[in-house]
Curated annotation (Swiss-Prot):
GO terms for biological process: positive regulation of DNA-templated transcription; response to gibberellin; response to salicylic acid; response to sucrose. Residues 18-73 form the Myb-like domain. This is Transcription factor MYBS1. It holds the Pfam family Myb_DNA-binding. Keywords: Activator, Cytoplasm, DNA-binding, Nucleus, Transcription, Transcription regulation. A motif (Nuclear export signal 1) lies at residues 72-86. Homodimer. Interacts with GAMYB. Expressed in aboveground tissues, with the highest level in leaves. Induction: Repressed by sucrose and gibberellic acid (GA). NCBIfam families: myb_SHAQKYF. Residues 92-109, 228-241 have a biased composition (Low complexity). The lineage of its organism: Eukaryota, Viridiplantae, Streptophyta, Embryophyta, Tracheophyta. One of its GO terms (molecular function) is DNA binding. Its main location: nucleus.
Amino acid sequence: MTSQAATTTTTAAAAAAWTREDDKAFENALAACAAPPPADGGAPDDDWFAALAASVPGARSAEEVRRHYEALVEDVAAIDAGRVPLPRYAGEESAAPPDGAGAAAAASKDGGHRRDERKGGGGGYDGGKSCSKAEQERRKGIPWTEEEHRLFLLGLDKFGKGDWRSISRNFVISRTPTQVASHAQKYFIRLNSMNRDRRRSSIHDITSVTAGDQVAAQQGAPITGHQATGNPAAAALGPPGMKHHHHHHPGGAPPPMPMYSAAPMGHPVAGHMVPAAVGTPVVFPPGHAPYVVPVGYPAPPAKMHQ
């Protein structure tokens, strides 16, 4: 008799085991079939449990559904009374559970209906919404360095405003396009803000990729990306017409003689050479006929024979 009773108990326990799918189906049926208020303040009547069992797959009997319902009520009461410890999240120090928490967790009886099993996705909440300290530090963001900001200015001058993906891929490879766009927004807000003398210094005050950024920001036009020049240093050098050409003549030599003018006195001549009447070579304009009278410096007069 003892062996037969043990076998019967094991079979009943196996039949009473509820899977996660069974729990979900039971919860859906419980939400669809609202329990009528009992007259004596106790559990609902047998007819309601029979209707609830018909909505639960797996051929559960009304008695099994009743035990499962009572286990659920006990779990909810234990949680409301504070006898169930709250789940620990990443980064929090582990604390010993309060007294009676283990007994409350074990008091769910043979239904096997644990709150930590019921929430299913709630168990994923511990790993889904919570994150490690390293993940939290990464989400806080790492401040931009001056080198990254200068690379951003190079990319802004190259690809223009709005092409953050190209700037991220070709210049600021350590930042994502979203981070580049956020940095650009702060940069333009800083560029257009008022009261520049009163505000604190920031990396967004750097508006040029050359040395002396603070002076360049006050005297020259900052990089805005509206006109991509392809050469970041072109804005700092200025337009080609602003360059000054200084001609240095080594050795103190006189400047070269113009092409279409007469040779000055005592100046060596070169070019289209023809013999002059007085024996002095002169310069003729190219393409002119040789009958033009050359202009040369006067020769000393010949001595008169007496």
